[in-house]
Amino acid sequence: MPVMKGLLAPQNTFLDTIATRFDGTHSNFLLANAQGTRGFPIVYCSDGFCELTGYGRTEVMQKTCSCRFLYGPETSEPALQRLHKALEGHQEHRAEICFYRKDGSAFWCLLDMMPIKNEMGEVVLFLFSFKDITQSGSPGLGPQGGRGDSNHENSLGRRGATWKFRSARRRSRTVLHRLTGHFGRRGQGGMKANNNVFEPKPSVPEYKVASVGGSRCLLLHYSVSKAIWDGLILLATFYVAVTVPYNVCFSGDDDTPITSRHTLVSDIAVEMLFILDIILNFRTTYVSQSGQVISAPRSIGLHYLATWFFIDLIAALPFDLLYIFNITVTSLVHLLKTVRLLRLLRLLQKLERYSQCSAVVLTLLMSVFALLAHWMACIWYVIGRREMEANDPLLWDIGWLHELGKRLEVPYVNGSVGGPSRRSAYIAALYFTLSSLTSVGFGNVCANTDAEKIFSICTMLIGALMHAVVFGNVTAIIQRMYSRRSLYHSRMKDLKDFIRVHRLPRPLKQRMLEYFQTTWAVNSGIDANELLRDFPDELRADIAMHLNREILQLPLFGAASRGCLRALSLHIKTSFCAPGEYLLRRGDALQAHYYVCSGSLEVLRDNMVLAILGKGDLIGADIPEPGQEPGLGADPNFVLKTSADVKALTYCGLQQLSSRGLAEVLRLYPEYGAAFRAGLPRDLTFNLRQGSDTSGLSRFSRSPRLSQPRSESLGSSSDKTLPSITEAESGAEPGGGPRPRRPLLLPNLSPARPRGSLVSLLGEELPPFSALVSSPSLSPSLSPALAGQGHSASPHGPPRCSAAWKPPQLLIPPLGTFGPPDLSPRIVDGIEDSGSTAEAPSFRFSRRPELPRPRSQAPPTGTRPSPELASEAEEVKEKVCRLNQEISRLNQEVSQLSRELRHIMGLLQARLGPPGHPAGSAWTPDPPCPQLRPPCLSPCASRPPPSLQDTTLAEVHCPASVGTMETGTALLDLRPSILPPYPSEPDPLGPSPVPEASPPTPSLLRHSFQSRSDTFH
């Protein structure tokens, strides 16, 4: 027969395991998604971390796990780089880092990062554990005195030997913490396993669905073996209920020794079974009041000691062993054996288990009726014996035993000797009690004395009741006693019939049955809304407020009036979700806001964990503007759709607030509507509205680019960039169209340097480069050459803004002395221009230099500086510094490339040799202009300082002179384009080596200079 198994669906108890295992020193932890495409966002934040840092859970969720909002001036940059490297490699990492709380106070933290794997071995989460070690004597943050010296040491300790000394001291302290076993974690490799030798390290749990089951020594209460054992104990209990009254009443009737009794062996065997049952009960699981299956040995033992242990212990006392060892016993010991009848209370406990089967219930009731008749037969026999002993045996012979002996012709001699046998007397007594219980009897065995008549009256009264229960209205009594269970079985039968008629698949059938059973275990089939429907609204609102007090105590409803809360409580319903079930799916219409009362859920998108929700979390979507509510605004078809899946990890109790009911209440209380719409995005743990990733989700990770106001000059300077380094373009060649330019291939000129991705370098929170174009007030001034020639419009040439316009000569802007120059739109290396007028693909780089602001400058009206804005400003400053470093490195590479190009020019000059003109040359070159710079490459108009020799190289057009070039000609005309700079202007790139000249090669000249549009890149 089936047993109530309890809540046995597989659950993902990862969150509870982490909170239990890292309790105390490791209660401050974060969980981050290791499979995210945009960094590693935080998906769970413990309450201890919020208390440690001062940030709320909604402020931390979806931010990067590197915790940039905790950085400050004393945060070590090398330690952060090692942390980022460990994150990219999915490796364990431990470090001591100086973090800053929300109020700006600094604290030293022992950061421990561990990857979490699933059942397939894939890293799906990162676990970050934070330990405040400020009071343990960390450098630079001592509790007393010396803070200024420590800060000075911190400012100087990042360079040279001081930094190495502090690093060594921190490593030694980390080893000390490992040896004391305060911070255990799963080791990797032999050396890590030996670091903690005094205490075993707790293993990191896997993020997976836990298997149901426990130790092999535990006995599951719903297993087959437990059912067989319960059946055996049930038979033993019936045996005790039959034999104990019989032995007590008929023990002193004959002279047979007790040790020769036929039931002695069976009695001892039953006692051993009861003792063994006590031992097994200490190892048997049970179902708690909340429906959970308890498998902890300690909890099982305490529960058994508080319930049935003493009753089972008294019933299992081995009284029959006293007879084996020939210990003299009195009649009181025989009466103590009646205590074993308390085992029948366990039978009443099992009746509820087997009550779902009508046949079993009827059988048990019949057995109880027969057992009652047996007990009354034993009492009827004792009454007859006591009547014989109380009266004169020579004169008194009217008892029912005397009458039975006369009829059986075995009369009593002297009132006590002789008489019918024990067997005959028991059968006659049982016959009398059964006839009295079921009817009025037949008179062959009747009551003659007063005591016998009183007992007969009691027997008839009990018989009338038992007859009505068993034979009169068994079905009515079962329905009255088990009405709720009958309803349960009725609904279960309807559910099974529905599944059978519609032929539902087995997985769907299992889910339906599991949900029905677990829901029934929570609310016992009571529909609160149906039950409270007939109550008045005033009383029903008060009851609803009491039932939904958890969700109504949120800060979101703090500004609501009592009437508003009463109206809201009437639209709140309690729901339940089993493990593995989807509460919402992506793209579904969001019709309610959900508050998690118990259990945990996960938010998924494309099988990636976006957030883990626990008790006290609110999930839903922000409310649209007034007039756009579903069914209330101008658009009645407006529907909010979910952007992710919500799946239950454990058994979850939820309270859902209907969106339509919420809109109705907000319309009735407009004074609270504005406060609710403003506070809902702040209190939502996760926003499920589609499009919140781009518009609303940014509130979780407040990007400095989005939270801080931008300068107006920034937007007006989107087109103020430095021009490319170009060369003048001559007039069109008559009779010929534009030819494609060929890049000058320079293989193996410099060793390859690996370049990191700019996206990974700048962080995912930086806006695109097109939005970071420098303004005129923030960018260095243009060179005089550009100012004088580049900004004048030509009436005959193409307009300056067109792609075909090029300056008349090589223009290189001068470098400022305040820092690395801004990078102008530049042609990507390796992309050839087909000669069209379309703009070539380019990258735009710009930098906004930090403008000094007077310290006395007050913040704008209505704004106050906060630690959060300060941390965001520090983050922006850090990213800008890193961008400047990258730009400087790129400029150095461009400078190196320029020097190599100059070296190649020198080699070409030596290869071509002195100029010469054959007599039959058809190309008459123009004399070079002594006032013009060489068109191929030229230094800047003003030499930059020696410390800044970085130059930008974008495009170098080297057009040849107009005409047809023959072999051995135009050497004299080509020399100006490849000559070194004028002696009067020193080369900022350094002297270029020019080897000795060599005779010209016709093939080289023919392939090198074919048209005036050949270019070098």
Swiss-Prot record:
Residues 138-157, 691-749, 772-803, 821-875, 971-1017 are annotated as: Disordered. Residues 691-724, 1008-1017 have a biased composition (Polar residues). Residues 772-787 have a biased composition (Low complexity). Residues 250-259, 324-332, 383-427, 449-482 are extracellular. One of its GO terms (molecular function) is voltage-gated potassium channel activity. Residues 139-148 have a biased composition (Gly residues). Detected only in brain, in particular in the telencephalon. Detected in putamen and caudate nucleus, and at lower levels in cerebral cortex, occipital and hippocampus. A motif (Selectivity filter) lies at residues 439-444. SMART domains: cNMP, PAC. InterPro entries: cNMP-bd_dom, cNMP-bd_dom_sf, Ion_trans_dom, K_chnl_volt-dep_EAG/ELK/ERG, K_chnl_volt-dep_ELK, KCNH_animal-type, PAC, PAS. GO terms for cellular component: plasma membrane; voltage-gated potassium channel complex. Residues 14-90 form the PAS domain. It is a multi-pass membrane protein. It catalyses: K(+)(in) = K(+)(out). Residues 978-1002 have a biased composition (Pro residues). The chain crosses the membrane at residues 229-249, 260-280, 303-323, 333-353, 362-382, 483-503. Keywords: Glycoprotein, Ion channel, Ion transport, Membrane, Potassium, Potassium channel, Potassium transport, Transmembrane, Transmembrane helix, Transport, Voltage-gated channel. Gene3D superfamilies: 1.10.1200.260, 1.10.287.70, Jelly Rolls, PAS domain. One of its GO terms (biological process) is potassium ion transmembrane transport. CDD domains: CAP_ED, PAS. Residues 93-145 form the PAC domain. The potassium channel is probably composed of a homo- or heterotetrameric complex of pore-forming alpha subunits that can associate with modulating beta subunits. Belongs to the potassium channel family. H (Eag) (TC 1.A.1.20) subfamily. Kv12.3/KCNH4 sub-subfamily. This is Voltage-gated delayed rectifier potassium channel KCNH4. It comes from Homo sapiens. The lineage of its organism: Eukaryota, Metazoa, Chordata, Craniata, Vertebrata. The gene is KCNH4.
